[in-house]
Amino acid sequence: MTSKISYIKFIREDIRHRSWLAVFSALVLFLAMPVYSAIYIDGMKGAQTVPGNTSAFITQNIRAIFPGLINGQNAMIVCYIIFLLAVLCAATGYGHIHSREKLDFYHSLPLRRMQWFSISYLSGILIFLIPYLINSFLIIAIGNMNGILNSALAVSSLIAVLGGCLVFLLIYTTCVLAMTLTGRTVTALLAGVFLIVSPLFILTTIESLEQEFFAAYYAPPGKAFFVNLSELLSPLGLSSKLLTCTGTYFPASAGSELTGITLPELLIPLAAGIIMTVLFLILSAVLYRKYPSEAAGNALAFPRSAPVLKVLACIPGAFIITDMIHAFTGMSLEKWFFPLSILTVLILTLFVEYIYRMDLRAIWRGWKSTLISIAGVAAIVSVLQFDLIGYDSYMPDEDNVARISILPDSFSNYFIYPSEYGPDSEIYLGFYVPEEDTALACSLAETGLRNAENGIEVPNTWEYSESESSDEKYMKTLFRFQLDSGRVIYRQYPLNREQLVPAVRSLLENKEFRKTIYPVFQLNRDDVYSINFSDSYQVPVELNLTDEQRSQLLDAYEQDLLAADASTLTEGTAIGSLEINIYDPFQPGTEALQNGMTADSVLGSPNLVGLSGFDLYPEYTNTLEFLENLGYTLRTEIDPEDVENLSITLSLDSVQSAKYSELFRTLPDGSASFTQYSTGEDVRTSDPEAIRLILDAIPPSRTELLDFSEDGGDSMEIEYKDGAGIGYYF
């Protein structure tokens, strides 16, 4: 039996044989960690000379990025070095198994295989771990010398050290597994890349193909199942997740939550990283123990696994490559996806056979696994192209729907909410309708499903059918079905104005639903920093209001909004709008600002969020009278005498179709200049009569709640005599 002293001796001897790697590890980590961090922090402190940047603001920013300097989250060179050292430690520690002479020599010594495995594994860890820990604590010391270290940052830094170590162990163990699976260094490198990268690409490609082939598919940002799974089942995805979570500053005021990251979001990746590392370590040890001496020099250590590994690699590889080609070229999926996938899998299988045998004449010997790979690709493509799983045709039974939400695309452009930028915001998922309107929303979803089945496609947000009539244009609408079982299903369907407007109008008859979707009812008035007002001139003017007047204005607006007819909200023409600026509750310094400190003493300037969706209609008498009493009169049209000049930029399509030629013929002679370009035409005028005629024909537009209008690629810029100006597409 080998004693502990002997183990230490063997580990030291192994490190001595790899002394170049130990020196390299110490040098690059020293340069990339304490040296880089000292320079970076000094550079950030020098930013205090910039007007508005206070010492407190700079310190706060340094603390926010400081943990990421330790684990590589905010210093990518450290991340790359961790990966590189993991590969080198595995390759140098287990390279002997790829040489028959070295393998026979090692196994002739009075040590069991598992003892050699443990010695190589531990020495590789120490080559990285010792310099990494030393340099990590040097960074923490630099932070302390610069006066930024506090107890919360110290804890965050230790978590970052843990994250960096775990990422190294994960990648290192994965590479060790690749070494024990293969018999040559080249194939070990390919196997390592495959093990580290392929799960991430496979799972994200599944998500991509679902989006490409299923018209009704929708995955909420941050909640895509296969993307989230890739962050836990892929060494690369999990490493990225670990660096992000552990490289975050954990302020004491956050209590049990990180800045934008909850405690479970930290613990789950840590647990997943430990579990994956342990599983790969056990598998590597088992393979090392069974590693045949004759495997050295062969492509694979266990030849019987070759066909299985070939199929498992080539089928997903074909889809990954084909999907990437589609992303870069925009090729037609219906025409090219099947033949290109078959061609790709054929090339991959032949390439793998060549790697196995290193003989071009023998690449057809594995024809059975090649046929299986081709058949597998053909079957999967058929499922996708013909929707054999019935994804697009599936509609939950209304009796099984506990509640349903609806979100037309235009809502996302019309409203901005106080909670929209929060880490847990679900505003982008839609608004649950009142229980009594569940049947109405389900019926609307069924209408959208029928539209999709009839071939109506709306590929992306704000893309419409080619019909000239806005009544025949279709808008994507997201439906979220929460079933009685608790399961949540997302689908998006195309709906036109005739179908969508009456349904939304009916929903808005319910006052509680209005309170749900309009941001004024979600507003914490203590967060309001300022209110801007704009009329037909569309130039925002900050209202000079006391706190009491601000509250009275919001009261009047809420009263008008609840009293308005639903048709006004869905089909009315706004004559003005309000914009409410609030302190951003998800940015540092907001709490201090609200507690009475000036913006300059905290951040240099306030962190604000501008909220939209506060249109003014002629029926809003309380709000309009309140503004008029304060001296803010709403102008319903632009006076040409107030305009200094007006310019129109027409797209090439508009020029070639003579879309506005009739309008331009009515302009007074010589009142406008026309300049043609290869991409279109510019029209400029400062003549009041020409300006009046143009504005009558093309008035400044406002975004509507249900906006089916389509920007034609033409734009207008208006410069007023007071120096203000606006620009918009029409």
Language model regions located:
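Helix-loop-helix units of permease transmembrane domains in multi-pass membrane transporters
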Residues: 94-126, 292, 296-297, 546-566, ...
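Long, hydrophobic alpha-helical segments
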Residues: 73-102, 113
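Junction motif at the cytosolic side of a transmembrane helix
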Residues: 2-4, 14, 280-314, 347-366
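Terminal transmembrane helical anchor/hairpin motif
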Residues: 40-69, 201-287, 292-301, 319-339, ...
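Secretory targeting signals
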Residues: 67-68, 75, 122-183, 187, ...
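Aromatic- and glycine-rich beta-strand/loop motifs that create alpha-glucan
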Residues: 1-24
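Function-determining sites in protein domains
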Residues: 365-374, 383-730
